[in-house]
From Swiss-Prot:
InterPro entries: G-protein_beta_WD-40_rep, WD40/YVTN_repeat-like_dom_sf, WD40_repeat_CS, WD40_repeat_dom_sf, WD40_rpt. Belongs to the WD repeat MDV1/CAF4 family. Disulfide bonds: none annotated. Residues 241-261, 393-413 are annotated as: Disordered. The gene is mdv1. SMART domains: WD40. Residues 207-247 form a coiled coil. This is Mitochondrial division protein 1. It is a peripheral membrane protein. WD repeats lie at residues 314-355, 356-393, 429-468, 474-531, 534-573, 575-610, 617-650.
Length: 650
């Protein structure tokens, strides 16, 4: 047996290695010998040429390496090393602490210099541990808690319970650690909230700066547009005066022409008539210069709803009518101080007065540069602001000199001037005060206390149709089978206007009266097409669009009607009578006897207040009651009983 074993070594081992390879790798002794020869030749090549100049220990070291590589154990270790990855090699040679130390020591100085200084008492690693997901821990903890929280019955053996203080301490330490992690997480969340608050504050400051810049741009834009409009008007005036100058200018006549003129007196009379005719001013034309708006203001769109834009001390008495053409455009106000004022909303300044009525103006409307005013003197006047010229005001209607001076001092008006040459004509067919009017295109409809509605042709300046409200209502009841006219609702209030509000569109006319009825008229036939019954008090305001008609009444309610069905679509009420109402695409605003404007959102149905009375101290003086409102494109203007006018975003 021993001899047989001795025979196997080394020739037997070499045969096995020759046949099977080393360690099952497929490498034979031939490969090993070839590798050894290559190492020897390489070492000899490196050391041989410079052997004379190098120390002798280099040669001895290379000889030792060659002898070591020829040993089978060394060869097996070398070939095993060739099959090992670098990661496994590092893991097998280095400990965890050494790996961390080498990783930190290998960082470049630039990265180490850019590490931010943090005053937090928690390290980055603690924050990372605190932000790790703990689902698995919760599951395991829940299972342990469910086992440990079972109720003990009286008959159970308490001695069988494991009393292991080590486990309890371990659980306590674990919970304490989790409490620390919760504290770290809370502080991290608090820091994030502070950072977000700082960012929001910075964004608000940036937004305010941009809003101020936008306001300045719109101011400059308005000034440029005003200058451009003045230049265009001057060019048009020059073009109109040029042909007149050509007609008036006559060539120099010769001596023969003079003798012929002296011989023919009829010709001389004709010449004098023509000369006088040229000096007679031509009647005012109804054609007016269109006021083209080249750009629309957008500043109010970036304010939060309910923000104050401007507040003006417009009048010294209660505002009775108010209207404007577009946001930051031209506003017209009328009050019981017998004045009608024109305002530039862009700067909040009064640009002049419209004088001509003999009493207070109850209703008005502005469309482009045309203004219509209805007064208690039973007249309707039409004004063209594009032809206005300013002059110092001389007097006011029904005011003494002392009262005029006091009123001028109390009113904050920059330019006390009267706008001349803007009056077009007067419509004087009514015999009672004009309480409502509306015009569109060349048609104007006016309602009066004489219980009539009149349709006016603005081109010719004359009345083309008179509608008797009582007679038309009686005729409508007769057609429905009732021979007598009876007002629906309560008896008309003596203090209410008989015609409270009206609006026209082409041949359609909606009119609200003191009997609480809303009548829809057909101007082509002059008949009532439909009557809307629902209000129990005088109708004070109305407005309609393509689908709905909204009405406000002294019965404290606002009703929204479906024009297609003739039925009530929605309704809501306030604590006091509704005196004025307007709506746009998003909201309905109303004046309901309070110091605020009542706002109703169409989309979500919410009610909220807007105006100077919002947030006012109940112990201090409250702002005056809002009596008139006007809303266009989210721009709200309200007039109060003390004469103050405020502009708000809505």
């Amino acid at each position: 047996m021993d001899k047989h074993r001795r025979d196997e070594s080394p020739s037997g081992l070499s045969d096995i290695v020759e046949h099977d390879g080393l360690l099952g790798t497929g490498l034979t002794t031939r490969h090993i010998e070839a590798f050894g020869r290559k190492v020897t030749s390489t070492a000899g090549h490196l050391i041989g040429p410079t052997g004379d100049g190098n120390p002798a220990h280099y040669h001895n070291a290379m000889a030792d390496i060659q002898r070591e590589l020829r040993r089978p154990n060394t060869q097996r270790r070398v070939f095993a090393l060739t099959q090992t990855t670098p990661t496994d090699l590092v893991r097998s040679k280095l400990s965890t602490s050494e790996i961390q130390s080498r990783a930190l020591s290998s960082l470049p100085d630039d990265l180490l210099a850019n590490i931010p200084d943090d005053s937090s008492s928690y390290s980055l690693f603690e924050g990372f541990q605190a932000s790790q997901d703990d689902i698995e821990y919760r599951k395991a903890h829940r299972r342990r808690a469910s086992k440990s929280k079972k109720l003990l019955k009286d008959g159970e053996n308490r001695a069988a319970l494991p009393s292991a203080p080590a486990e309890l301490k371990k659980e306590r330490d674990l919970l304490s650690r989790r409490m620390e992690l919760m504290g770290v997480r809370k502080n991290m969340c608090s820091s994030e909230i502070h950072d977000i608050d700082n960012k929001i504050a910075n964004l608000h400051n940036m937004r305010k700066i941009v809003l101020d810049r936008l306001a300045g741009l719109e101011m400059e834009e308005a000034e440029l547009e005003h200058e451009l409009t003045e230049l265009e008007n001057k060019l048009e005036d020059i073009q109109e005066e040029t042909p007149e100058t050509a007609v008036v200018g006559t060539p120099k006549s010769s001596a023969n022409d003079e003798s012929m003129a002296s011989e023919d007196p009829a010709m001389d009379a004709s010449f004098m008539s023509e000369s006088i005719y040229q000096k007679i001013p031509s009647p005012k034309s109804l054609k007016h210069k269109s006021k083209r708006k080249r750009s629309m203001p957008i500043l109010h769109e970036h304010f939060s709803p309910g923000s104050l834009i401007k507040e003006m001390e417009a009048h010294t008495d209660m505002v009775t009518a108010i209207d404007f053409d577009y946001p930051f455009g031209t506003m017209i106000t009328a009050a019981l101080d017998d004045t009608v004022r024109v305002w530039d909303l862009n700067v909040g300044r009064c640009t002049g007065f419209l004088e001509g009525h003999n009493a207070s103006v109850r209703c008005l409307q502005i469309e482009d540069n045309i203004v219509a005013t209805g007064s208690m003197d039973a007249s309707v006047k039409l004004w063209d602001l594009s032809r206005a010229r300013s002059r110092p005001r001389s007097s006011r209607i029904n005011k003494h000199e002392d009262e005029e001076d006091a009123a001028d001092d109390a009113s904050q008006v920059s330019h006390s001037t009267t706008l001349e040459d803007c009056h077009v004509f007067s419509l004087d067919s009514h015999v009672g005060e004009v309480t409502a009017l509306h015009f569109r295109g060349d048609n104007l409809i006016s309602g009066s206390a004489d219980k009539t509605l009149r349709q006016w042709d603005l081109v010719k300046g004359r009345c083309v149709q008179t509608l008797d409200v009582l007679w038309a209502a009686a005729q409508a009841d007769t057609l429905n089978g009732d021979s007598t006219w009876r007002p629906s609702g309560r008896v008309p209030d003596a203090s209410a206007d008989f015609v409270g509000a009206l609006q026209c569109f082409d041949a359609a006319l909606a009119c609200g009266t003191a009997d609480g009825m809303v009548r829809l008229w057909d101007l082509r036939s002059g008949q009532v097409h439909r009557s809307l019954v629902g209000h129990t008090g005088p109708v004070t305001c109305l407005q309609f669009d393509d689908v709905h008609l909204v009405t406000g009444s002294m019965d404290r309610s606002i009703r929204i009607w479906d024009l297609r069905m003739g039925s009530i679509y929605d309704a809501f009420a306030y604590d006091k009578p509704v005196t004025s109402m307007k709506f746009d695409a998003k909201r309905i605003v109303a004046a309901a006897g309070e110091s605020v404007v009542k706002v109703y959102d169409k989309a979500d149905g919410n009610h909220w207040d807007c105006g100077a009375g919002v947030g006012a101290d109940e112990q201090g003086p409250l702002p005056a009651t809002v009596d008139r409102v006007c809303l266009k494109d989210g721009f709200l203007v309200e007039g109060r009983q003390d004469g103050i006018v405020g502009a708000w975003t809505c």
